């Protein structure tokens, strides 16, 4: 065989190897450690610290600057990481965890703003589905976009408006002293690609929480404190009432959670989310994790402790107490630990 033939054979072999490496079946898994684990992604550093402190046989892995801690927590093999605030951070850290560890289930926890006015500061909300209402089509006014030839059709742009009962969700309008101001913000479904729906992919608005994990969450009975550990200055003393929330926090399961790239402090938009979506809570990470979980076929659940009623000043004193006393991270960790206990002993 001459050099020309050797070159051709080598080129064909290299091309075949490259093609094989690009196929979905050749995707590498658990690049760092391959013990089956529950992945815990915390958006709140203090809570992650509590969980890591209680983890048995902890081992820290630093991947792309992110510290992942493996070990056993309440008898369950886990890997714990802090995502930090934002949809993008949540997406990147969750996918990094999925790539480098053998994650069989995902748990997200952290702080959130309340949307349902019936809830109180300190309540821990466990929604049964999550959505991203700030994925929008921003029209010039509140007229239904007809970009692709008919009302509400934006398919030629690779987009789809979110709808309820077959009708697009009405756009948000801002009330002002001069009257209602249309924003032209129409909610969209977002596009997700998985091994199961490739190559066409699909549009989704809601990402349902895993039914088995939700059943365990409904059964747990964690004791949630009204005063955080820092509310008591000296051992045996009464807690400082200014560092306690007024209403004993409860665990509330069900309803829709929503996430977005904005920090929500607008009471009008909060009301809009509650009226149009019956949203229970708003934050900046979970729906992104849910998208990653769905794309990777990994069941997930999320726990969120309410820091306030988003944009409502009347809850400011309780919000201060929640953070200053350490109550936020204490109650969040209590729910996560109770869930792991329940998960370990599930039938």
For each feature predicted by the language model, list its residue ranges.
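Bacterial N-terminal signal peptides that target proteins for export
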Residues: 1-8
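Bacterial N-terminal signal peptides
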Residues: 9-18
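Accessory terminal and edge-of-domain segments that mediate assembly/interaction
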Residues: 22-347
